[in-house]
Amino acid sequence: MDINTKIAEELGIRKEQVSAAVKLIDEGCTIPFIARYRKEATGALSDEILRNLYDRLVYLRNLEDKKQTVLASIEEQGKLTEELRAQILAAETQVAVDDLYRPYRPKRRTRATIAKEKGLEPLANLILLQKMTVSPLEEAKNYVNPEKEVATPEEALNGAKDILAEGISDNADFRTHIRELTMKHGQLLSAAKDPDAESVYEMYYDFNEGLSKLAGHRILAINRGEKEKFLTVKIEAPTDRILSYLDRKIITNPQAFTAPVLHEALEDAYNRLIAPAIEREIRNDLFEKAEDGAIRVFGKNLEQLLMQPPIAGQVVLGWDPAFRTGCKLAVVDPTGKVLDTTVIYPTAPQNRVDEAKAVLKKLISKYHITLISLGNGTASRESEQIIVQLLKEIPEPVQYIIVNEAGASVYSASKLATEEFPQFDVGQRSAASMARRLQDPLAELVKIDPKSIGVGQYQHDMNQKLTEALDHVVEDCVNRVGVDLNTASASLLEYVSGVSKAIAKNIVVYREENGKFASRSQLLKVAKLGPKAYEQCAGFMRISDGKNPLDATGVHPESYAATKQLLETLGYTLSDVTDRNVAGISKKVRDYKKLAQDLEIGELTLRDIVKELETPARDPREDMPKPILRSDVLEIKDLTPGMVLKGTVRNVIDFGAFVDIGVHQDGLVHISQMCDRFIKHPLEVVSVGDIVEVKVLSVDVKKQRIQLTMKI
């Protein structure tokens, strides 16, 4: 199999693009680096396509390794035919290779191997030939051998049937067809272990659906219900169809003496050996596909969350609400530095509202706070009421926003938070994190395990695959935005292309010991950061007030000479870059192709350089919807059907989206209520962070459920 050709066909791109990308990957280049700085080589493949390419490359290389291992094993046994070799080499999945290898795989002792040890294989072969002139039981008398523990003809015949059953089970073609029949016509059944038990899985207490129609979120929910011992789950296969298929394939002479015995053997093969294995395989396959779908949705949600626009230039009050232990506050300046922390007790059981308001007024006046970032956890509703009352009593124009607390408690108790804020307690760290999440969501959220951020579905049921996928999303976001080399934390730096955790820490140590970086080239003095790591990371690092103004842009150092030549050609200097006097540079470029040849760089690289010079270090997050800032409060009891509101999409799942309309309980817009056309997935219409207009369909105050529609 030519791996590059296959990947090109699957992804709908040219083989040359795949070959170039594979070569760069094998040379140790990262996906963000290839996507951004090697566009000529790959034909400008996006980071998303490159990720898919990489995943398929790993899978297909592992598949090729497996094929070679299997071929070597069969050849060692002296059983490798040219036909079998061709079948194995042509196999496109690991399951197909497993099916072909099954008859030759070293087996533990089975009923069939025991029967073979007793000398019953010739009898099994005779039955399979279907040319007996006497009944199989009569023929079996010839195989009675007390020394080999075959005491009766019945025992001999049963042993032969065991051999036949295993042979049928090991047939790769049979397994493939049975798997397809089961997927096409089979049903997944789930039932309650205790029908009276209350749980979130009640809709699956008596559930069945065709395997080919099962939605991913249902599979994940059913699996979790089974794991938590609320459900029993099984696959109901089209057994009659399958047995008829095996009958047609195996019994060539229905009138032969051997037909009933063969039918018993194939029934046993299916019920005892094939069906349980196929059920396991199908359930694993369904889970894997559901998992992949959930990971894609989670990744998209996480990307939108990380790419939320920063709220710059404001002094923010972070508010971590609580009852008994009090509300923790942290005042954070526009650079993220914590100016002050305190605790107030406006909520039950203390209810010291006036005292709390006095503290808040003093903080707002002293630090010129313009924005309050309130966590959405316990006591959030009560805290919001106090904030709204306060805003009506003060002259300063202060607004507030409710932020998702997910992951804040994990972060505030982590070793990283302890190192960052050694003098603060867990609550104060959490309050500081609330404020910083608004000021720079990306820089703050990278400190938290992505699985704890709260924008997925069933993420805690998933494995290493999810962790890797989410790390890739974070990596792509961080490199798309770029990082300030002189202020970025180690948590942020470790996601930069080519930078490991150890190198990230070394960058921070170097900065602490030597002061600010004056140029990108200084990175080469950082311990463990060699030329390859420098090549991969330099373009994504920004120095805003360094010696070279190009260090503040996304232009890679390898293109500095060409960039200086470009500026000279068009009548500019590096000082013009510093003074932002190159805004109209693109209008001066008449012929990109010719100019690129003159500069000895690629045309795509030239276009990127011109774009960077026109808008140096432009933040792509500026294009994202801005968060809704509030100054008044709404409660769920205030909602009535037909009310139209603006809200923020907080989470997207397979069957809809949850929208924050400012009432502490997110409302659900079902997929059917998103638009008038048919859509396969909500992500076709909305993303996390989107500002949407919704209409209230129904409100259940008791169950705290709000149904919304976007069809207004």
Question: Can you annotate each of these PLM segments?
Answer:
Residues 98-102, 111-112, 126-128, 134, ...:
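S1/OB-fold single-stranded RNA-binding interface
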